[in-house]
Amino acid sequence: MPDAQLGDKDLDDEYITDAWLVDQHVGNVLFSWGDNYAGCLGDGTTTDRSSPVQVGTLVNWKQVSAGYQYSVAIKNDGTLWSWGWNFFGQLGHGDTANRGSPVQVGSDSNWKQISIGYRTSLAIKTNGTLWGWGENDGGALGLGDTANRSNPVQVGTETNWKSVFSSGYYAWAIKNDGTLWSLGGFNNQGQLAQGDTTFRSSPVQVGSLTNWRHISEGMAIKTDGTLWAWGANSQGQLGLGDTVDRSSPVQVGTLTNWKNISAYGSTCQAIKTDGTLWAWGANSQGQLGLGDRTNRSSPVQVGTLSNWKQVGIGVQFTMAIKNDGTLWAWGGGFINNGQLGLGNTVNYSSPVQVGSLTNWKQVAGGDSHTLAITYREI
């Protein structure tokens, strides 16, 4: 199992604001598909789905994040909901019982952003506080220890956290002042970007810069549009043209037009400000979308289109949304449970459209399941 952030989850601010609700007549509908172990699709069953299935009847979903056989989401009212596998308490309900349908986490209504990786959950509230729960084997919750938590626990006392990215065995976050922090976790390949391979279980600042804007697994974009990478690199996932690990951030090329990135395990997908999509890293199942299964150690453009809006990576598969609201999928995984949503269990090495809808808003890939939000008139 790759030690990776499961799904996207690493949205820019423009994707996690109330601007999603264009007006009072538009609602956000949640769909899921793929592997349904422990009810992680949230449809009240454990039946795998190879095509999108609506989760309940509500139209107030704001952001979703998919992990290892579990799911977490935020509604427009700021409440937090989770479902699926819960062996490590990763659902945040104070127990280890699985849930087959969405259940509210506590009673707070001020959750802003959620990022779950493998079996570790991290979230930020509107007051800028950071919270963690679930598996903590590597100290990735940033709580100063390696004890699991089954309820959300505040990370430190700071109230200036802006965004967070959980990769399961390590995590990072950006503060409002633009500083980048590694929260903790295993660091045997320099994943914490501290210039060493020392294990940590509490937040430590990465360098001294104050211009970090967007974070994913071992990848980050600065406010100047430059892309930086660090950590494991056995599959060329750092995009530096080699397979050498890095324990400190290194710039990827010289371009200054990177907009957002989704890195998962050993695969990376990124969108530039011109709307083009670029991929690199592991490609054993065609997850780079380049028409083959050859790894790449430098960014390569996916097709020739310039209308990509958001991309989310799961385990050996990729989901992406275009500006026209269409949803596309490729890859599939060593085991394909229908996570591409194409009505079959076939792997694809080039983008294939999922259905015919043109109202997809956000997509998140997990271990072998996918969550996505559409909007519709209500």
For each feature predicted by the language model, list its residue ranges.
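Enriched but not universal
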Residues: 1-27, 31, 375-378
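Short glycine/serine- and acidic-residue-enriched loop/turn motifs that recur at repeat junctions
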Residues: 31-50, 84-101, 134-151, 183-201, ...
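Conserved core positions of repeat-based scaffolds
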Residues: 32, 70-73, 82, 120-123, ...
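Surface loop/turn motifs at the tips and blade-to-blade linkers of beta-strand repeat domains
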Residues: 55-56, 105-106, 155-156, 206-207, ...
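Tandem repeat domain/solenoid detector
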Residues: 59-63, 76-79, 88, 101, ...
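Blade-level signature of beta-propeller repeat domains, shared across WD40, Kelch, NHL, RCC1
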Residues: 347, 363-378
